[in-house]
Amino acid sequence: AQSRFLAGYLGPLVRKVLVGPYREWTPVSPEQKKYWHPRYRAESLTALTRLVSWNHEINLAKLKIPVLILYTPFDDVVEVSSIIKKFNELGSKKKSLLSIPSKNHVLAGAITSPETTELVTQEMLKWIQGLNSKE
């Protein structure tokens, strides 16, 4: 909901009031602190929310390329119902929506989701190999 305010005409002003000059978060591990950027300029939030808003205007029925969407039903960053809705709008004949049992928005990687990295890798490889089939 906040993102709608940030994407609008008054987005920069709203951002300054709600966030200030920087967006900061606390890393959950020393590795995350080492390899991620937990502090960045808040202007990027306005740009990101405008990009997301623009994406909502795209006619996905016209999209005919193969699409694989991986998501977690536990996502606290993206609304899962929106992921499913957008997937159903895709005009692609070869499309797959795959739920990954990760507790994190980032579905794979040694730092945030080591328990699902192998699963994500295998599912992606299987999907890519399936592109050659004549379904």
Q: What do the PLM-derived regions correspond to, one by one?
A:
Residues R39-A42, V77, P114-E118:
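Soluble non-cytosolic domains of exported or imported proteins
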Residues A1-T49, I65:
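Hydrolase active-site cap/lid region
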Residues L63, I69-D75:
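Short beta-strand/loop motif that positions the catalytic acidic residue
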Residues E57-A61:
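Surface-exposed acidic, glycine-flexible loop patches that form ligand/cofactor-binding
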Residues V52-N55, V67, I128-N132:
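Sec/Tat-exported extracytoplasmic proteins
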Residues L98-E135:
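Catalytic active-site module of serine/aspartate enzymes centered on a nucleophile-bearing elbow/loop
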